[in-house]
A protein has these predicted regions:
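Short, surface-exposed basic-aromatic patches at helix termini and helix-loop junctions that form
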Residues: 55, 80-87, 105-119
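Short, flexible loop/turn elements at secondary-structure junctions
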Residues: 36-40, 56-58, 69-71, 97-99
Length: 279
């Protein structure tokens, strides 16, 4: 019954996109996991903003783009914009089974561009664990759980993602990669490498051109993390003010996690539980 419900509208497309679970080469740059993060607040009815979240597996590089609704065309345009900003070639993209991604438009695009396209197993969120982690540390922990559904909010979120949040996370927030996981007497022991930023991992990968390296170095030298942090806080304050103005003051839930704020901790790549404080 679940199979019929899930694939009944267009079963052939699910046969075109192979299922992939855990078999990733974590040293190969260009494998991108994609996902949608809903900003619907306490109600999923009506039209609201969604964040298209993209995480590169080998380096932890992240990009985001906000869209109104879940339309396939808007989601596709967001993905192409993100791909244009990426400082590496996309070799493969991997999504869950959301119809915003599982459609012929994206399948044909992947074929035309020579990009692999795979999907998670049904009801197995851990198959998309890299981007799921970024959804928490980069999206939810930053802009909260409020409902955003206006063009003004959409403009602020996109400006935040492109101009401040992505540079701040990619160039200045180190993450640790899981090197080894061993089971000893029924207990799992994990070993991690030295914390590095996605920028550092990309520069050390040996998989980007010298021209791209110089461009990234120039961007890095032009950035000031303290200034980025101030701008992030300023835009989050503006986003909160627009939300209050839209709904009327005093109507916001007291649930603390709903309110947007910036997270200045770095996180372990593919370990969803342990934050590493930046000193």
């Amino acid at each position: 019954l679940k199979r019929r419900h899930h694939q009944g509208n267009n079963p052939l497309i699910y046969q075109e996109i192979p299922v992939k679970a855990g078999s990733w080469d974590r040293s190969l740059v260009g494998q991108v996991q994609i996902d949608l993060v809903e900003h619907c607040g306490q109600s999923a009815s009506g039209l609201f903003i969604n964040s298209v979240s993209c995480a590169e597996i080998a380096t932890g590089w992240w990009e985001g783009e906000a869209v109104m609704g879940k339309g396939q065309e808007r989601t596709f345009n967001a993905l192409t914009n993100i791909r244009k900003r990426a400082p590496f070639s996309w070799l493969e993209m991997h999504s869950d089974n959301d119809k915003a991604f599982i459609n012929w438009h994206l399948v044909r695009y992947a074929e035309q561009e020579g990009i692999g396209f795979s999907r998670s197993r049904k009801y197995k969120k851990n198959d998309n664990c890299f981007v799921e982690q970024k959804n928490s540390t980069h999206v939810r922990s930053t802009i909260g759980h409020l409902r955003y559904d206006t063009d003004k909010e959409l403009e602020i979120i996109n400006s935040l993602y492109r101009d401040e949040l992505a540079p701040y996370k990619n160039f200045f927030q180190p993450v640790m990669k899981l090197k080894e996981k061993i089971r000893i007497k029924g207990k799992i022991h994990r070993k991690y490498d030295v914390p590095k930023t996605p920028y550092e991992r990309l520069m050390e990968s040996g998989q980007i051109s010298e021209e791209t390296k110089k461009q990234l170095q120039n961007i890095y030298q032009s950035l000031n993390p303290a200034e980025l942090k101030r701008k992030i806080d300023k835009k989050l304050k503006k986003l909160y003010e627009v939300y209050e103005e839209k709904n009327g003051r005093g109507k916001i839930s007291s649930f603390k996690k709903q309110i947007p704020h910036v997270n200045t901790e770095s996180y372990i790549l593919n370990d969803l539980t342990t934050p590493i404080s930046v000193t």
